[in-house]
Amino acid sequence: SCSCKRNFLCC
């Protein structure tokens, strides 16, 4: 899963 807090590319 993606998390914006960890990886801004997922936002």
Swiss-Prot record:
Pc16a is the amidated form, whereas Pc16b is the non-amidated form. Signal peptide: none annotated. One of its GO terms (molecular function) is toxin activity. The keyword Disulfide bond applies. The modification Cysteine amide is found at residue 11. Disulfide bonds join 2-10, 4-11. Keywords: Amidation, Disulfide bond, Neurotoxin, Secreted, Toxin. It is found in: Secreted. One of its GO terms (cellular component) is extracellular region. Expressed by the venom duct. Negative results: the native peptide has no effect on nicotinic acetylcholine receptor (nAChR) subtypes human alpha-4-beta-2/CHRNA4-CHRNB2 and chicken alpha-7/CHRNA7. The synthetic peptide has no effect on a wide range of mammalian and insect voltage-gated sodium channels and voltage-gated potassium channels. The cysteine framework is XVI (C-C-CC). Potential neurotoxin. No target has been identified for this peptide. This is Conotoxin pc16a. The lineage of its organism: Eukaryota, Metazoa, Spiralia, Lophotrochozoa, Mollusca.
